[in-house]
Amino acid sequence: MIALIQRVSRASVTVEDEVTGEIGPGLLVLLGVEKDDDEQKANRLCERVLGYRIFSDAEGKMNLNVQQAGGSVLVVSQFTLAADTERGMRPSFSKGAAPDRAEALYEYFVARCRQQEMNTQTGRFAADMQVSLVNDGPVTFWLQV
């Protein structure tokens, strides 16, 4: 399971001219689900995303996680993160989970974030989405479990 996380000043996702999720300061989480992923990996990734210390403390050091910084999370499904790009000029998506399984794990990940009392907004699984963000830093990390 892969999360590309970006520290943002604000972010939103729109589907068919409807804003489905919008946050102020926090994390934009682009989430990719691979074939061998399961609930245990989703739990671990959720723990890492919410606990990752990439927000500045009073001394300007990256020492606070999103919860400590009072931020929110916007989770957007992105199957292209599971692409195999090692060869050729066209990505292969053979490493990605089947759509039904990917959606179930995406929803599970979102539920785990919400269980941690995290303000969690979302896109719409498998939809054509427009994601807008202001990357703060920029600060972007690839987390994989």
UniProtKB/Swiss-Prot annotation:
Give the highest taxon in the source lineage: Bacteria
Q: Which GO terms describe its biological process?
A: D-amino acid catabolic process
Query: Gene3D superfamilies, per this entry?
Result: D-tyrosyl-tRNA(Tyr) deacylase
- Which cysteine residues pair off into disulfide bonds? none
Q: Where is this motif: Gly-cisPro motif, important for rejection of L-amino acids?
A: 137-138
Does this UniProt record's set of keywords contain Transport? Answer: no
Where can this protein be found? Cytoplasm
Reaction equation(s) it catalyzes: glycyl-tRNA(Ala) + H2O = tRNA(Ala) + glycine + H(+); a D-aminoacyl-tRNA + H2O = a tRNA + a D-alpha-amino acid + H(+)
| Enzyme superclass (EC) | hydrolase
Hydrolase as a keyword of this entry, yes or no, is yes
Q: Which InterPro entries match?
A: Daa-tRNA_deacyls_DTD, DTD-like_sf
Keyword set, alphabetical order: Cytoplasm, Hydrolase, RNA-binding, tRNA-binding
Molecular function in Gene Ontology: D-tyrosyl-tRNA(Tyr) deacylase activity; Gly-tRNA(Ala) deacylase activity; Ser(Gly)-tRNA(Ala) hydrolase activity; tRNA binding
Which Gene Ontology cellular component terms are annotated?
cytoplasm
EC assignment: 3.1.1.96
The UniProt similarity line reads:
Belongs to the DTD family.
Q: How does it assemble?
A: Homodimer.
User: What job does this protein perform?
Assistant: An aminoacyl-tRNA editing enzyme that deacylates mischarged D-aminoacyl-tRNAs. Also deacylates mischarged glycyl-tRNA(Ala), protecting cells against glycine mischarging by AlaRS. Acts via tRNA-based rather than protein-based catalysis; rejects L-amino acids rather than detecting D-amino acids in the active site. By recycling D-aminoacyl-tRNA to D-amino acids and free tRNA molecules, this enzyme counteracts the toxicity associated with the formation of D-aminoacyl-tRNA entities in vivo and helps enforce protein L-homochirality.
Database matches in PANTHER family: D-AMINOACYL-TRNA DEACYLASE 1, D-TYROSYL-TRNA TYR DEACYLASE
Domains: entry comment: A Gly-cisPro motif from one monomer fits into the active site of the other monomer to allow specific chiral rejection of L-amino acids.
Q: What is this protein called?
A: D-aminoacyl-tRNA deacylase
Origin organism is Klebsiella pneumoniae (strain 342)
